[in-house]
Swiss-Prot record:
Family membership noted in the UniProt record: Belongs to the PEPCase type 1 family.
GO annotation, biological process: carbon fixation; oxaloacetate metabolic process; tricarboxylic acid cycle
Tree of life domain: Bacteria
PROSITE patterns linked to this entry: PEPCASE_1 (PS00781), PEPCASE_2 (PS00393)
Protein name: Phosphoenolpyruvate carboxylase
NCBIfam families linked to this entry: PRK00009.1
Enzyme Commission (EC) number: 4.1.1.31
Entry keyword set: Carbon dioxide fixation, Lyase, Magnesium
Classification via PANTHER family: PHOSPHOENOLPYRUVATE CARBOXYLASE
GO molecular function: magnesium ion binding; phosphoenolpyruvate carboxylase activity
Alphabetical list of Pfam families matching this protein: PEPcase (PF00311)
Catalytic site positions: 137, 542
Biological source species: Pseudomonas putida (strain ATCC 47054 / DSM 6125 / CFBP 8728 / NCIMB 11950 / KT2440)
Catalysed reactions listed for this entry: oxaloacetate + phosphate = phosphoenolpyruvate + hydrogencarbonate
Amino acid sequence: MTDIDVRLREDVHVLGELLGETIRQQHGDAFLQKIEDIRHSAKADRRGPGEQLSSTLADLAEEDLLPVARAFNQFLNLANMAEQYQLIRRRDADQPEPFEAQVLPELLGRLKQAGHSNDALARQLAKLDIQLVLTAHPTEVARRTLIQKYDAIAGQLAAQDHRDLTPAERQQVRERLRRLIAEAWHTEEIRRTRPTPVDEAKWGFAVIEHSLWHAIPSHLRKVDKALLEATGLRLPLEAAPIRFASWMGGDRDGNPNVTAAVTREVLLLARWMAADLFLRDIDALAAELSMQQANDTLRKQVGDSAEPYRAVLKQLRDRLRATRAWAHSALTSNQPAGADVLVDNRELIAPLELCYQSLHECGMGVIAEGPLLDCLRRAVTFGLFLGRLDVRQDAARHRDALTEITDYLGLGRYADWDEEQRIAFLQAELKNRRPLLPAHFKPQADTAEVLATCREVAAAPAASLGSYVISMAGAASDVLAVQLLLKEAGLTRPMRVVPLFETLADLDNAGPVMQRLLGLPGYRAGLRGPQEVMIGYSDSAKDAGTTAAAWAQYRAQENLVRICAEHQVELLLFHGRGGTVGRGGGPAHAAILSQPPGSVAGRFRTTEQGEMIRFKFGLPGIAEQNLNLYLAAVLEATLLPPPPPQPAWREVMDQLAADGVQAYRSVVRENPDFVEYFRQSTPEQELGRLPLGSRPAKRRAGGIESLRAIPWIFGWTQTRLMLPAWLGWETALTNALARGQGELLAQMREQWPFFRTRIDMLEMVLAKADAQIAEAYDERLVQPHLRPLGAHLRDLLSQSCQVVLGLTGQPVLLAHSPETLEFISLRNTYLDPLHRLQAELLARSRSREAALDSPLEQALLVTVAGIAAGLRNTG
């Protein structure tokens, strides 16, 4: 075991000890002993037949349920914190830098060896367009208050690492840790009420304020340094290879709580927050830039001021204050922005650039390259709006709105027309100069809301908005329909209208739809920039299983690359990935490098889900590592794309997908007991009651199809069966081996990044799955006639593990990553009691009606949060 592992274990031990002290102070020695007994029972059950823990938990008194659940939940959160800090802790001089820190310098060296010139590398790096789209998440269960306390704990772990602390200073750090852990323990970890979409947006702003605001300039300094060392060239001031967007407050698909008024409020809050953050920067810069010497350009702006830089910054500060004040008052009353309000990012960037250039020209470059450069980088990356807000709505809502409009105008019912009739009507209206809607038209509520959203889009500054995403898009008319509704709302500038292809059938149809759209007269001429298309990972996996979904996503991207090239249109693919493998999640670096050749091309857009935002971007140091990985992967996929798959590999993949979807659907769709088994064996029904997000967990009444992808995955994750991530692979791979394709599969794993990444993700999820835990849920919750189905699914899980081990040639899953295995094992000691306790709580909850705020329901909520924290990927 390395020194690093030892230090991690020490941190976990210290945090656990301090938590124990806190619990003892509130609940006494006897209760703390109970926690220890449960922990030891969990360890014993891992080694033996597994009877001890269940009987210990079944004997718990009602009043002990909540504090026991809280104890194990808090421990897992502290263990997460220690592991996150471990990733960024200062290394000794003789230890190598982490992979994330070396990835860009190493890649630039490889690219030069491959024949790319210095100029070409610098140019490509400067024009990279990577957009990380932060999305709200029903399963992001940790409260902001607690996240801030955990961040402070990480800060104390860092302080504790300093070698030159005196005994008194070391004691001080220990006391601060003790106090923070006590604060966390005495803070309720679960919201009593559902967050609103505005609450979710504020959570996103907090991630920017506390982490990304600090990470971006530091990350870009290192990119600049790596580029300079490799090529002798600098990263231009206007370069922002990575920018941010958001769905929080803009994603109304299936969420009636996201209204036009909410979108307006979130856009204003973003402007207020941006002005406030930049004001803090400008105040700090004004204190520093006291120099007198300035170039003529700057002098022209401020005259003969004795402190010219401060004079420039004062002008900017006054405008930022005016912007912040206006945004604040506009939240409550609809008032136009005054002349002082900043509306264009250039108004923010220009004064900073002026100071930067002047300092360099006057021989004060060392000052220019300090905090002023950091502020400039932030201004270019975040701008006056922090990021762009996307709008998302279901295609059916636009269809219904147009049907009401055409019906009212006596033109017939839009919904009843075929695709050609719709396209003819939409194209004619898009060209028409007169409005489609008469002034006295009074639409129904749903149509009124769609039109109000379009008016908000038309009224907002262009730089504050990203894309208008159409979920469940299935035809070219779906895109034209949105363009027409936006035109009716008064939008005169081009806006990216983005079809989202989600189900297996839609992915297979994505090529023909885009072929039709790009072939329409005038459509391409209206594009400003690339054609954006979104690929959905969650619904396709729920519909067909991950084997068939992954291959359909790959083929759809290949087709889109080819079709856009034929039409001489640039393509931007937007990847709608979840945090889990069942929703397209996984390590971003590997995922980007496994995309089809030509599909990245300097541009990459992806969603970042709630709970993964915290793990990937919650601390500035970790955010920096993940930004490095994104940047390097997109640059590599652009300049060193993988070769296309060999025909033999494609044939194997076609067969794997066909076998996989059949095996998956035979269980999920064709077994009449499946839905009932799912509802009984997982906390799926209870998840709908929990205040876990602003969006309802169900679409409509019905079977699996009515479930949203998130609770579908979440339920299986809580019971550790992890079914959506692997079901179908066991049959597909077993059949391939039976056909004698073992050597071909090994070759694919070795030489084809797409296939290797799929198998690596499968191995990771199987290592976290646990048949013993899943069986414990069945024994406590499932009626006897459904238990054979549970046993069958666990057999399939075992088969999946065996076939993956056969493919990797390893004795155990993740044998190549002992540190990951060790951490899974460390977590299991604290996860096992939470799983068993959750099964016990579900049984008690289902046997009687409990109020939402009862200790029983609260304890159930805490187990959900704890298991999500322990597995670090929820839904």
